[in-house]
Amino acid sequence: MIKRILFWSILPFGIPQGLLLRRNALRFGAAPGETFGVIGNGKRISLVAIGDSIVEGVGAGRADNALAGATAKHLARILEAEISWQAVGKIGATSLSVLKELVPLLSKNPVDVFVVSVGVNDVTSLSRTGRWAAHLTNLFKSLRAHSPKATIVMVGVPPFGRFPLLPKTLQLAFGMRGKTFDVVARQIIQQMEGVIHVPLDFDPQPEKFSADGYHPNAKSYSEIGLAVAEAIAAKPS
């Protein structure tokens, strides 16, 4: 309750800064290259990353350096397996737009692993926590209906409070809101079988970001992919 009051109290002071930021900020597109591939040798495992700009690879340099490709590279090494990977993403996607627009794009073939990246745009679009919880729950249920035996991994909401691009007021406001949304996500995941939360609790130094000051660079994508791959590998069969 206190965090919610603080967020809505601070936010009006950040709105002018946000408008100026929207006008002047660097904007990168999706990373070039194929959004699917196969890597490694051994037992074949299919992996689909679905979600926002982290799936699209903004700041990654190449599409195979983004969330799906980075996770696949590490997972192939850890499990000594052949990973067939695909990225289904949209810049600016929220939990609701992923559910309504991206899930219908999935192949009808069931997959072994889903990696989900949502939350950033739910925070910045000022979604209410109740809507966030409902949309996220429905997204997980939809993925489970698509692939009943899949492991579903959600990448945690990142630490807005240290994003170099954001002015201090927005760092504070979105930082608090992001933590709240991440707690809600954890609570939902605890009630679901076969769903894993991988926190983004890295130290967000400026050198961890791409030139836009908002998205990861290729090295950080690799670190996130490693964390996701280790979580998948550690899950009991």
Residue ranges and their predicted role:
Residues 1-48, 61, 229, 233-237:
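N-terminal secretory targeting modules
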Residues 19, 54, 92-94, 159, ...:
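Residue-level detector of flexible, active-site-proximal loop/helix-junction positions
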Residues 25, 90-94, 173-174:
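Short, flexible loop segments at the rims of nucleotide/cofactor-binding pockets, characterized by
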Residues 27-43, 100-107, 137-146:
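Short amphipathic alpha-helices and their capping/turn segments at secondary-structure boundaries
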Residues 46-48, 54-135:
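Conserved SGNH/GDSL esterase-like catalytic core that processes O-acyl groups on lipids
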Residues 103-237:
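Alpha-helical cap/lid subdomain in secreted, periplasmic
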